[in-house]
Amino acid sequence: MNGMITRREDFDLEEILPKLKAYSPTGVVMATTCKEREVLPGDGYKVALLDLGAKKNIGDSLHKRGCEVNIYPADTKAEDILAANPDGIMLSNGPGDPKECTEIIKEIK
């Protein structure tokens, strides 16, 4: 669902509405992912978090529960994540249309 915040009162809703409905941002996963691997040290389970636009709270919540959290950029190769021998792999939520992430989805599979 798209929306608009404006202070203007003099706009034509009939003119703007089709533009709002057609608006579809691209490249948002790569624009929001971390740029390099981040580690939140812990003594519990070792979790790999693939950052597809993750909110900071996701990694923090796992870390707070004792997990070692390795946060990886969205374009990280599967072999690099698996080489760290994680106990589990988590895919974060993120912005945009998943259909745009064909290479990431292929790598995950």
Label every PLM stretch briefly.
Residues P18-T26, P41-D43, G66-D75:
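Phosphate-binding glycine-rich loops and adjacent basic patches that engage nucleotide phosphates
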Residues S24-L49, D80-A83, I104:
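Glycine-/acidic-rich phosphate or pyrophosphate-binding loops and their flanking alpha/beta elements
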Residues R7, D12, L40, K77, ...:
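Serine/threonine-rich low-complexity intrinsically disordered regions
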Residues M1-R37:
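Internal gly/pro-rich beta-alpha loop/helix module
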Residues M1-N2, G42-Y45, C67, N85-P86:
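Short coil/turn connectors at secondary-structure junctions
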Residues K55-K109:
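Flexible gly/pro-rich beta->alpha loop and the following alpha-helix that scaffold active-site loops
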Residues R8-E9, K35, L50-G53, A74, ...:
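Fold-independent oxyanion-binding glycine-rich loops
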